[in-house]
């Protein structure tokens, strides 16, 4: 009897010890939502090389610049970029004041819920929607409208607030590189004012470290108070070749670490790779149709084609969501 009891105690103690060891190991792992595959190993090895004093690849903290695309890299982008879904909701809200929209594209497609028709309108149609829904209000008014939208809007598939559609592995990566002296920036084709309304809370990246597309602003006095009014004119598009241009214009330093997910990020990765010393270039490849989506070369949103070919040819890191991420989204709040 005593022998059986003793064995049970030993078994329980071993189980507790193993569980405790697992907890300690997880706590010590800076990237617990990443599987122990090649991309994770490459990332950790790179960070250790550039932060270890005496290493031939050591980079001073002031030069540890990391840039991240947003759509499809830090958060989801299907069935359409979330800022466009916001703009579509604004079109529907404003439609009673504009009966002409029922017969005029791209507004007709928006009101009919015709996603294919909207995409067929191309960049011109999407920019027109953005201009009509964003312009005329102050930056403070726009910020408030965006914040209110995030409180009520839900993703059609996952039924979660859009600002919860962020990738847990990338949240961990942001925290990891910051803990190692990196300064993290968003460099995205999304609207800078839209991103500034949610990104500081979602990613712990302050507004002054967010580079994005932007429209023109106009200074005015309204009711005796100075305001900045959003105009229906594009000032800068932070996509493709615009990304390295934006990095130089608004950051002033070439990154040593850059992550994207589509052909729109190709030039940012090329610009990063062209610098001297150790460099990391990464792409998120959407390969998990069950937990997220699977798309690449033929997608209307987040197309990954030429950048993928270049990544393979040059040995950049390509992260497969299905194979390399143990978790996609954070737990629901």
Residue ranges and their predicted role:
Residues 1-7:
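N-terminal secretory signal peptides that target proteins for export/translocation
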Residues 9-10, 14, 20, 24-70, ...:
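Non-catalytic pre-domain segments flanking phosphatase-related domains
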Residues 27-34, 41-44, 48, 63, ...:
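C-terminal cap/substrate-recognition subdomain and adjoining C-terminal extension
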Residues 52-54, 75-77, 219-220:
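Short, solvent-exposed loop/turn elements at domain surfaces
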Residues 64-78, 269:
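Asp-based phosphoryl-transfer active-site loop
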Residues 74-77, 117, 197, 208:
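Secretory-pathway/luminal and periplasmic proteins that interact with or process carbohydrate-rich
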Residues 77-80, 85-88, 197-198, 271:
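Short, solvent-exposed loop/turn and secondary-structure capping segments
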Residues 80, 85-164, 168:
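A metal-dependent, Asp-based hydrolase signature
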């Amino acid at each position: 009897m005593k022998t059986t009891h003793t064995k049970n105690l030993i078994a329980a103690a071993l189980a507790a010890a193993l569980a405790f060891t697992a907890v300690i190991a997880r706590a010590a792992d800076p990237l617990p939502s990443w599987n122990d595959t090649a991309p994770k190993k490459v990332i950790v090895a790179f960070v250790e090389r550039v932060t270890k004093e005496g290493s031939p690849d050591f980079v001073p903290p002031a030069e540890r610049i990391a840039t991240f695309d947003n759509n499809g890299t830090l958060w989801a982008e299907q069935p359409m970029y979330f800022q466009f879904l916001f703009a579509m909701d604004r079109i529907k809200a404003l439609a009673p004041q504009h009966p002409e929209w029922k017969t005029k594209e791209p507004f007709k497609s928006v009101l009919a819920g015709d996603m294919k028709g909207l995409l067929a309108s191309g960049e011109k149609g999407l920019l027109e929607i953005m201009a009509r829904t964003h312009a005329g209000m102050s930056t403070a008014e726009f910020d408030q409208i965006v914040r209110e939208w995030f409180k009520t809007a839900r993703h059609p598939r996952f039924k979660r607030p859009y600002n919860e559609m962020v990738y847990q592995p990338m949240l961990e990566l942001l925290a990891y590189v910051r803990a190692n002296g990196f300064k993290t920036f968003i460099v995205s084709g999304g609207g800078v004012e839209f991103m500034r309304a949610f990104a500081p809370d979602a990613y712990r990246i302050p507004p002054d470290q967010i580079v994005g597309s932007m429209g023109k602003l106009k200074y005015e006095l309204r009711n005796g108070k100075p305001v900045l009014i959003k105009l229906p004119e594009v000032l800068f598009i932070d996509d493709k070749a615009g990304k390295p241009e934006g990095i130089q214009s608004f950051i002033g330093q070439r990154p040593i670490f850059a992550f994207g997910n589509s052909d729109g990020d190709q030039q940012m990765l090329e610009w990063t790779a062209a610098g001297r010393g150790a460099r990391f270039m990464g792409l998120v490849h959407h390969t998990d149709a069950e937990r997220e989506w699977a798309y690449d070369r033929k997608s209307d949103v987040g197309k990954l084609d030429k950048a993928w070919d270049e990544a393979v040819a040059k040995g950049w890191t390509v992260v497969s969501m299905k194979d390399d991420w143990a978790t996609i989204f954070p737990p629901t709040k």
